[in-house]
Curated annotation (Swiss-Prot):
Its main location: secreted. Transmembrane segments: none annotated. Residues 1-20 form the Peptidase S1 domain. GO terms for biological process: proteolysis. The lineage of its organism: Eukaryota, Metazoa, Ecdysozoa, Arthropoda, Chelicerata. GO terms for cellular component: extracellular region. Coiled coil: none annotated. The keyword Secreted applies. The gene is DERP6. It is found in: Secreted. Belongs to the peptidase S1 family. This is Mite allergen Der p 6. Its EC number is 3.4.21.-.
């Protein structure tokens, strides 16, 4: 997910919580 990688799906929950 970091850097808009294609594997963002795996870090979706983490990214959403961080950006929240």
């Amino acid at each position: 997910a970091i850097g808009x990688q294609p594997a963002a799906e795996a870090e979706a929950p983490f990214q959403i919580s961080l950006m929240k």
